[in-house]
Amino acid sequence: MAANTDPRLQNQVIYSIYVRNHTSEGTFRAVIPDLDRIRALGTDIIWLMPIHPIGVEGKKGTLGCPYANRDYRAVNPAYGTMEDFEALVREIHARGMKCMIDVVYNHTSPDSVLYREHPEYFYRGPDGKPGNKLGDWADVIDLDYSNRGLWQYLTDTLVMWAKLVDGFRCDVASFVPVEFWLQARAAVAAVNPDCVWLAETVHRSYGCLARRHGVYSASDGEVFRAFDLEYEYDVREVFDQYLRGEVPLSRYLDALSFQEACYPANYNKLRFLENHDQPRIASFVRDERALVNYTAMLYFLKGTTLLYAGQEFENDHLPSLFDIDPIDRRTGRDLSGLLRRLYAVKQQFGSADWFFADADDVNDLALLQRGSAGKRFVGVFSLKAKAADVRVDAADGVYENLIDRSAVTVKNGILSCTGEPVILRAEG
């Protein structure tokens, strides 16, 4: 963890918005009327996916990918003006939330302002042409961090935005030198000492692939030196395997236990069921009670919770990044009430809890514990919504299920799970 990371981040919730698809208008100002609803979910930070102009050369789809950035220092005119953006940030702040923007510093679009002004800042392949160090992406070209002039340009850009916003979600942060992030963090701290830094670290297999091809890829442990929290892609592949029925639940929970063993006690992973790069969880989990269990487990896990806009409506369609594809708020159930209750439960947890995970593979039950400073919480999550008797680490007695205030009985060390999620506070 960064030396000055705010421990309160552990129990906060980030809500991710893609401006183009959040409303039918697709503008900064059109987001504003929805802010009260978003705040009421228990949102602490709004993360706006890339707000900058999008490249045209090699673009994907009709409108291009927002991660093919054409100008780091401007806003996408399709979303509005800089004044419109500033108005949105003010309204976010007025509701007690922070605003985080996307930082895409691994690459730009081929027709970017930066490439036009400083072609020397870009990686060139064996043919001498700008391109990609790994893979072949038509809509982006990679930056070359061996040029220190690039470091200064990007750092100055971050300082500019840090005077307006409260944090940065840094795309493919593992492929950018950690020393650059440390320099940038120090410079930003001079104008915004409370800035929140979120790293999109890469999937374990992708990081290994990069290294096999001689491409720099920092480990999650290295990235933590400069960041407050980072993606949980180090365990995501195992989670996806469980969703597809390829491995038992215990494999995923063992991966969570490995995180607990190999990171500092106050490590903070961004926990999510879905994001703009991952399929909607509702497209995998069709049983509504099972989906409630997954959602409750998400909030119980150690780390900051991420909600991707539309998740609260059980959307099963992942919106396109490249075309107009507004969120449909009429699909599935409205989980807003559940999310509010889970947020209230999350506020009871410690900021550097110990965490323990066990599994009942026969019944697909996740048996989790966390605690600190004399507090201990037990969570039972039935990921296939099965009813089963399960042994729990809690004294016999009647407990309050913190999720819905119902009574839960433990007798002879056994809790009778009805298929609904349970979180209780235990002694010791």
What do these predicted regions represent?
Residues 171-264, 269, 297, 316-350, ...:
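Active-site-proximal helices and loops of the catalytic beta/alpha 8
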Residues 162-169:
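Short, surface-exposed connector motifs at secondary-structure boundaries
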Residues 263-286:
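Active-site clefts of carbohydrate-active enzymes
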Residues 1-47, 53, 86, 90-92, ...:
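Carbohydrate-interacting/catalytic domains
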